[in-house]
Regions:
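Inter-heme linker and motif-flanking segments adjacent to c-type heme-binding CXXCH motifs
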Residues: 1-63, 67, 85, 105-120, ...
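Short amphipathic alpha-helical heptad-repeat segments
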Residues: 61-68, 91-97
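Non-transmembrane amphipathic alpha-helical segments
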Residues: 65-79, 102
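Amphipathic, non-membrane alpha-helical rod segments
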Residues: 82-125, 129
Length: 140
């Protein structure tokens, strides 16, 4: 399973408003967002790039998981066409669905809010998709 991994800011008792200081508009609504300047204000000038680094890293991991998800789905389609037994097909579908749930958590939750935890969750998605491919490549 996935171990609880509190965000780094949790340890210093910082809530959303500690980082989301920049006033902005989103779909006509006033919102507060995180900004590189906010990171640098509390830390160092080098921390200005932290948010973009986190976004890039999480984005790359999500992209990788999505690509593996497609491979798992393609393997499932091929297994169905080859006439694999219904138990194997059902198991593969369950593993793909589990992987999709983990992937969706990070997509919806915006992984930069807790990068370490997001990567841990995405690891579970990767495992489910890889296990599906292995199951179907082994012939069930």
């Amino acid at each position: 399973g996935i171990r609880a991994t509190p965000h780094l800011m949790f340890k210093v008792n910082t809530n959303c408003m500690g980082c989301h200081l920049k006033k902005d508009l989103n779909k006509g609504h006033a919102v507060r967002t995180g900004a590189p300047e906010t990171c640098a204000a509390c830390h160092t000038p080098e921390h200005k790039k932290m948010l973009s680094d986190w976004r890039k890293q999480v984005g790359n991991e999500v992209k990788g998981a999505q690509e593996l998800e497609l491979e798992a789905q393609e393997a499932l389609e091929q297994a169905i066409q080859k006439g694999f037994d219904s138990n194997t097909i059902a198991e593969a579908r369950e593993m793909i669905a589990a992987g999709q749930k983990f992937l969706e958590i990070v997509r919806i939750g915006n992984g930069v809010h807790n990068k370490k935890y997001a990567i841990t969750i995405l690891d579970e998605a990767f495992i489910n998709f890889e296990d599906t491919i292995d199951l179907l490549n082994d012939g069930g």
